[in-house]
């Protein structure tokens, strides 16, 4: 007795099961892994580190665009037989995450400064743990063929240590120094912020001419 075909394409179940099958078969792993006994050092790899999305909630269309583009490049090189690796990860987001955590605490009537540094950092890590899984699930849902066994977080001990070491080396070489500069200052966070973190607001004002 023949089975009736569904009237609509059940993309959620079909694509989820296909993605799981790809992963279980190890198709997202590099074929020339340096840890393998068959490693060929002359076989040049193709590696991309994913621009890590911030752990600030959910992905947006911009993330979907770059994930699709990078996945296209990764799959293209993989199909050519080139050792291919796509390293996934997420970013702690710094001030952006801090602001969201502060807003969440404010709803509970809690102030960051009253909470103290250590307790506040605990709240930040709780936020990361909560939204990290959602973001990773969304990246997987997009079909990203990353090697998830190599996933990193920008505040992982290894990453943090590497950043501190490079920063210290640059400082000792005199390439990092303090000086008087015009900066963007946030009176709420009591810290400097970058240009891309600025939110501009247009206001009507007077235009003065000096005779």
Label every PLM stretch briefly:
Residues 1-211:
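N-terminal, positively charged nucleic-acid-binding surface of large information/translation enzymes
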């Amino acid at each position: 007795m023949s089975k009736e075909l569904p009237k609509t394409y059940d993309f959620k179940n079909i694509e989820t099961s296909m993605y799981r099958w790809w992963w279980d078969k190890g198709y997202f792993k590099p074929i020339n892994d340096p840890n393998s006994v068959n490693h060929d050092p002359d076989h040049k790899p193709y590696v991309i580190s994913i621009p890590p999305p911030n752990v600030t909630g959910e992905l947006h269309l911009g993330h979907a665009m770059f994930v699709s583009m990078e996945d296209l490049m990764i799959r293209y090189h993989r199909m050519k037989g080139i050792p291919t690796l796509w390293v996934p990860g997420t970013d702690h987001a710094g001030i952006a995450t801090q602001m969201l955590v502060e807003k969440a605490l404010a709803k509970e009537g809690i102030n960051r400064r009253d909470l103290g540094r250590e307790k506040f950092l605990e709240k930040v890590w709780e936020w990361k743990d909560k939204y990290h899984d959602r973001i990773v699930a969304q990246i997987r849902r997009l079909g990203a063929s990353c090697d998830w066994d190599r996933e990193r977080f920008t505040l992982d001990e290894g990453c943090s240590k590497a950043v501190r070491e490079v920063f210290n080396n640059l400082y000792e070489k005199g390439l990092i120094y303090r000086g008087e500069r015009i900066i963007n200052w946030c009176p709420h966070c009591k810290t400097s912020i970058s240009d891309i973190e600025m939110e501009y607001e247009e206001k009507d004002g007077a235009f003065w001419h000096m005779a």
